[in-house]
Amino acid sequence: MFKLTEKGEKIQEMFDTIAPRYDFLNRVLSFGIDRSWRRFAVKKIKYAPNGRILDVATGTGDVALEIAARTPSSVSITGIDFSGEMVELGKQKVAASSYAGRINMQVAPCEDIPFADDSFDSITIAFGIRNVVDRSQGLKEMYRVLKPGGRVVILEFSTPRFVLFKHLYHFYFLKVLPVIGGLFSKFSAYKYLPDSVIEFPSQDQFKATMAGVGFKNTQHHDLTLGIATVYTGEK
Protein backbone atom coordinates (compact mmCIF):
# COMPACT_ATOMS: atom_id res chain seq x y z
CA MET A 1 0.00 0.00 0.00
CA PHE A 2 1.59 3.27 -1.13
CA LYS A 3 1.87 6.06 1.43
CA LEU A 4 2.91 9.64 0.75
CA THR A 5 6.03 10.89 2.50
CA GLU A 6 5.75 13.76 4.97
CA LYS A 7 6.89 16.13 2.21
CA GLY A 8 4.32 14.64 -0.16
CA GLU A 9 1.56 15.12 2.40
CA LYS A 10 2.52 18.78 2.83
CA ILE A 11 2.43 19.34 -0.93
CA GLN A 12 -0.94 17.56 -1.10
CA GLU A 13 -2.31 19.77 1.68
CA MET A 14 -1.01 22.87 -0.08
CA PHE A 15 -2.83 22.01 -3.31
CA ASP A 16 -6.01 21.17 -1.41
CA THR A 17 -5.82 24.64 0.14
CA ILE A 18 -5.21 26.64 -3.05
CA ALA A 19 -7.60 24.58 -5.23
CA PRO A 20 -10.48 27.13 -5.24
CA ARG A 21 -8.22 29.88 -6.70
CA TYR A 22 -5.92 27.66 -8.73
CA ASP A 23 -7.36 28.27 -12.21
CA PHE A 24 -7.72 32.02 -11.69
CA LEU A 25 -4.17 32.44 -10.45
CA ASN A 26 -2.74 30.29 -13.26
CA ARG A 27 -4.28 32.65 -15.81
CA VAL A 28 -3.17 35.80 -14.00
CA LEU A 29 0.35 34.76 -13.06
CA SER A 30 1.19 33.32 -16.49
CA PHE A 31 -0.59 36.15 -18.36
CA GLY A 32 -2.73 33.45 -19.96
CA ILE A 33 0.22 31.83 -21.74
CA ASP A 34 -0.31 28.54 -19.90
CA ARG A 35 -3.26 27.78 -22.19
CA SER A 36 -1.08 27.85 -25.32
CA TRP A 37 1.52 25.67 -23.60
CA ARG A 38 -1.13 23.06 -22.80
CA ARG A 39 -2.42 23.12 -26.39
CA PHE A 40 1.12 22.56 -27.69
CA ALA A 41 1.61 19.62 -25.33
CA VAL A 42 -1.70 17.99 -26.24
CA LYS A 43 -0.78 18.11 -29.93
CA LYS A 44 2.09 15.73 -29.12
CA ILE A 45 -0.07 12.85 -27.87
CA LYS A 46 -0.63 9.60 -29.79
CA TYR A 47 -3.87 7.66 -29.77
CA ALA A 48 -5.71 4.90 -31.60
CA PRO A 49 -9.42 4.65 -32.44
CA ASN A 50 -11.19 3.83 -29.18
CA GLY A 51 -7.94 4.69 -27.43
CA ARG A 52 -7.33 5.62 -23.81
CA ILE A 53 -5.36 8.59 -22.53
CA LEU A 54 -4.26 9.19 -18.95
CA ASP A 55 -3.70 12.69 -17.56
CA VAL A 56 -1.59 12.50 -14.40
CA ALA A 57 -1.67 15.35 -11.86
CA THR A 58 -4.79 16.44 -13.71
CA GLY A 59 -5.60 19.18 -11.19
CA THR A 60 -8.86 20.82 -12.15
CA GLY A 61 -8.92 19.06 -15.51
CA ASP A 62 -7.59 21.67 -17.95
CA VAL A 63 -5.45 19.20 -19.89
CA ALA A 64 -8.08 16.46 -19.81
CA LEU A 65 -10.62 18.87 -21.31
CA GLU A 66 -8.10 20.03 -23.93
CA ILE A 67 -7.47 16.41 -24.91
CA ALA A 68 -11.20 15.78 -25.22
CA ALA A 69 -11.57 18.84 -27.45
CA ARG A 70 -8.81 17.65 -29.78
CA THR A 71 -9.56 13.93 -30.08
CA PRO A 72 -12.45 11.89 -31.54
CA SER A 73 -15.38 11.05 -29.30
CA SER A 74 -14.27 7.40 -29.31
CA VAL A 75 -11.20 8.30 -27.23
CA SER A 76 -11.66 8.12 -23.45
CA ILE A 77 -9.68 10.20 -20.96
CA THR A 78 -8.86 9.46 -17.34
CA GLY A 79 -7.49 12.10 -15.00
CA ILE A 80 -5.81 11.34 -11.68
CA ASP A 81 -4.49 13.66 -8.98
CA PHE A 82 -3.43 13.21 -5.36
CA SER A 83 -5.38 16.31 -4.29
CA GLY A 84 -8.99 15.46 -3.53
CA GLU A 85 -10.01 19.12 -3.64
CA MET A 86 -8.50 19.55 -7.10
CA VAL A 87 -10.26 16.44 -8.38
CA GLU A 88 -13.60 17.61 -6.97
CA LEU A 89 -13.29 20.94 -8.80
CA GLY A 90 -12.22 19.08 -11.93
CA LYS A 91 -15.29 16.85 -11.78
CA GLN A 92 -17.47 19.95 -11.61
CA LYS A 93 -15.76 21.46 -14.67
CA VAL A 94 -16.09 18.22 -16.61
CA ALA A 95 -19.77 17.86 -15.67
CA ALA A 96 -20.43 21.37 -16.96
CA SER A 97 -18.66 20.66 -20.27
CA SER A 98 -19.78 18.80 -23.37
CA TYR A 99 -17.24 16.04 -22.64
CA ALA A 100 -18.72 14.67 -19.42
CA GLY A 101 -19.22 11.18 -20.86
CA ARG A 102 -15.60 10.87 -21.98
CA ILE A 103 -13.63 12.02 -18.95
CA ASN A 104 -13.32 10.15 -15.68
CA MET A 105 -11.45 11.68 -12.74
CA GLN A 106 -10.25 10.06 -9.54
CA VAL A 107 -7.87 10.60 -6.64
CA ALA A 108 -4.56 8.76 -7.02
CA PRO A 109 -0.84 9.61 -6.71
CA CYS A 110 1.59 9.48 -9.60
CA GLU A 111 3.81 7.07 -7.67
CA ASP A 112 1.03 4.45 -7.46
CA ILE A 113 -1.16 4.61 -10.58
CA PRO A 114 -4.19 2.29 -10.08
CA PHE A 115 -4.27 0.73 -13.54
CA ALA A 116 -2.93 -2.41 -15.19
CA ASP A 117 0.24 -2.57 -17.24
CA ASP A 118 0.01 -1.41 -20.87
CA SER A 119 -3.34 0.39 -20.42
CA PHE A 120 -2.95 3.77 -22.17
CA ASP A 121 -2.01 5.03 -25.63
CA SER A 122 -0.59 8.26 -24.22
CA ILE A 123 0.04 9.76 -20.81
CA THR A 124 0.23 13.47 -20.08
CA ILE A 125 1.32 15.40 -17.01
CA ALA A 126 1.36 19.21 -16.97
CA PHE A 127 3.12 21.21 -14.25
CA GLY A 128 3.00 18.18 -12.01
CA ILE A 129 6.15 16.10 -12.28
CA ARG A 130 8.22 18.52 -10.18
CA ASN A 131 5.70 18.01 -7.33
CA VAL A 132 6.18 14.24 -7.34
CA VAL A 133 8.50 13.56 -4.40
CA ASP A 134 9.76 10.22 -5.76
CA ARG A 135 10.12 11.39 -9.35
CA SER A 136 11.75 8.21 -10.63
CA GLN A 137 8.98 6.08 -9.16
CA GLY A 138 6.38 8.34 -10.77
CA LEU A 139 8.06 7.97 -14.16
CA LYS A 140 8.31 4.20 -13.68
CA GLU A 141 4.58 4.02 -12.99
CA MET A 142 3.78 6.05 -16.10
CA TYR A 143 6.04 3.78 -18.14
CA ARG A 144 4.35 0.70 -16.67
CA VAL A 145 0.79 1.69 -17.60
CA LEU A 146 1.76 3.03 -21.04
CA LYS A 147 1.16 0.70 -23.98
CA PRO A 148 4.16 -0.44 -26.05
CA GLY A 149 4.66 2.23 -28.72
CA GLY A 150 2.75 4.75 -26.60
CA ARG A 151 3.99 8.22 -25.75
CA VAL A 152 4.39 10.23 -22.57
CA VAL A 153 4.09 14.02 -22.83
CA ILE A 154 5.38 16.07 -19.91
CA LEU A 155 4.87 19.84 -19.68
CA GLU A 156 6.87 21.58 -16.98
CA PHE A 157 8.27 24.97 -16.03
CA SER A 158 11.95 25.45 -16.78
CA THR A 159 14.66 28.06 -16.37
CA PRO A 160 15.37 30.22 -19.47
CA ARG A 161 18.89 29.99 -20.86
CA PHE A 162 19.14 33.53 -22.29
CA VAL A 163 20.95 35.41 -19.50
CA LEU A 164 19.04 38.73 -19.51
CA PHE A 165 15.66 37.03 -19.77
CA LYS A 166 16.72 34.55 -17.09
CA HIS A 167 17.37 37.42 -14.65
CA LEU A 168 14.00 39.05 -15.42
CA TYR A 169 12.27 35.70 -15.07
CA HIS A 170 13.89 35.01 -11.70
CA PHE A 171 12.93 38.46 -10.42
CA TYR A 172 9.29 37.92 -11.39
CA PHE A 173 9.20 34.33 -10.19
CA LEU A 174 11.03 34.86 -6.89
CA LYS A 175 9.87 38.35 -5.92
CA VAL A 176 6.65 39.28 -7.70
CA LEU A 177 4.76 36.00 -8.11
CA PRO A 178 4.66 35.02 -4.40
CA VAL A 179 3.35 38.47 -3.47
CA ILE A 180 0.60 38.48 -6.10
CA GLY A 181 -0.31 34.87 -5.34
CA GLY A 182 -0.40 35.66 -1.62
CA LEU A 183 -2.98 38.39 -2.18
CA PHE A 184 -5.48 35.83 -3.45
CA SER A 185 -4.36 32.56 -1.93
CA LYS A 186 -1.76 31.04 0.39
CA PHE A 187 1.57 32.91 0.23
CA SER A 188 3.66 29.85 1.08
CA ALA A 189 2.20 27.97 -1.89
CA TYR A 190 3.38 30.62 -4.32
CA LYS A 191 6.76 30.73 -2.61
CA TYR A 192 7.01 26.97 -3.07
CA LEU A 193 6.27 27.23 -6.80
CA PRO A 194 9.39 29.20 -7.87
CA ASP A 195 11.59 27.26 -5.47
CA SER A 196 10.43 23.96 -6.97
CA VAL A 197 11.02 25.22 -10.52
CA ILE A 198 14.54 26.42 -9.80
CA GLU A 199 15.38 23.09 -8.15
CA PHE A 200 14.06 21.09 -11.14
CA PRO A 201 16.81 19.46 -13.25
CA SER A 202 17.92 20.82 -16.61
CA GLN A 203 16.31 19.56 -19.81
CA ASP A 204 19.16 17.15 -20.54
CA GLN A 205 19.25 15.89 -16.96
CA PHE A 206 15.52 15.22 -16.92
CA LYS A 207 15.63 13.43 -20.28
CA ALA A 208 18.37 11.24 -18.82
CA THR A 209 16.07 10.41 -15.90
CA MET A 210 13.31 9.50 -18.36
CA ALA A 211 15.68 7.28 -20.31
CA GLY A 212 16.82 5.69 -17.06
CA VAL A 213 13.35 4.25 -16.40
CA GLY A 214 13.02 2.97 -19.97
CA PHE A 215 11.63 5.75 -22.16
CA LYS A 216 13.07 5.89 -25.68
CA ASN A 217 13.32 8.69 -28.25
CA THR A 218 13.27 11.31 -25.50
CA GLN A 219 13.03 14.86 -26.82
CA HIS A 220 12.31 18.31 -25.45
CA HIS A 221 10.79 21.47 -26.89
CA ASP A 222 11.38 24.81 -25.16
CA LEU A 223 8.42 27.21 -25.14
CA THR A 224 8.32 31.01 -24.68
CA LEU A 225 12.10 31.47 -24.51
CA GLY A 226 12.46 28.50 -22.20
CA ILE A 227 9.94 29.42 -19.50
CA ALA A 228 8.30 26.04 -20.07
CA THR A 229 9.43 22.82 -21.70
CA VAL A 230 7.56 19.89 -23.24
CA TYR A 231 9.29 16.52 -22.92
CA THR A 232 8.26 13.44 -24.90
CA GLY A 233 9.30 9.82 -24.69
CA GLU A 234 8.04 6.48 -25.99
CA LYS A 235 7.77 2.92 -24.71
From Swiss-Prot:
Pathway where this protein functions: Quinol/quinone metabolism; menaquinone biosynthesis; menaquinol from 1,4-dihydroxy-2-naphthoate: step 2/2; Cofactor biosynthesis; ubiquinone biosynthesis
GO molecular function: 2-methoxy-6-polyprenyl-1,4-benzoquinol methyltransferase activity; demethylmenaquinone methyltransferase activity
Family matches, as InterPro entries: SAM-dependent_MTases_sf, UbiE/COQ5_MeTrFase, UbiE/COQ5_MeTrFase_CS
One record GO biological process: methylation
Top-rank EC class of the record's enzyme: transferase
Reaction(s) this enzyme catalyzes, per UniProt: a 2-demethylmenaquinol + S-adenosyl-L-methionine = a menaquinol + S-adenosyl-L-homocysteine + H(+); a 2-methoxy-6-(all-trans-polyprenyl)benzene-1,4-diol + S-adenosyl-L-methionine = a 5-methoxy-2-methyl-3-(all-trans-polyprenyl)benzene-1,4-diol + S-adenosyl-L-homocysteine + H(+)
Residues noted as binding S-adenosyl-L-methionine in the record, renumbered to the chain: T60, D81
SUPFAM superfamilies for this protein: S-adenosyl-L-methionine-dependent methyltransferases
Pfam families: Ubie_methyltran
EC nos: 2.1.1.163, 2.1.1.201
Similarity comment text for this entry: Belongs to the class I-like SAM-binding methyltransferase superfamily. MenG/UbiE family.
Protein's job: Methyltransferase required for the conversion of demethylmenaquinol (DMKH2) to menaquinol (MKH2) and the conversion of 2-polyprenyl-6-methoxy-1,4-benzoquinol (DDMQH2) to 2-polyprenyl-3-methyl-6-methoxy-1,4-benzoquinol (DMQH2).
NCBIfam families, sorted: MenG_MenH_UbiE (TIGR01934), PRK00216.1-5 (NF001244)
Protein name: Ubiquinone/menaquinone biosynthesis C-methyltransferase UbiE
UniProt organism field: Geotalea daltonii (strain DSM 22248 / JCM 15807 / FRC-32) (Geobacter daltonii)
Species classification: Bacteria, Pseudomonadati, Thermodesulfobacteriota, Desulfuromonadia, Geobacterales
Gene: ubiE
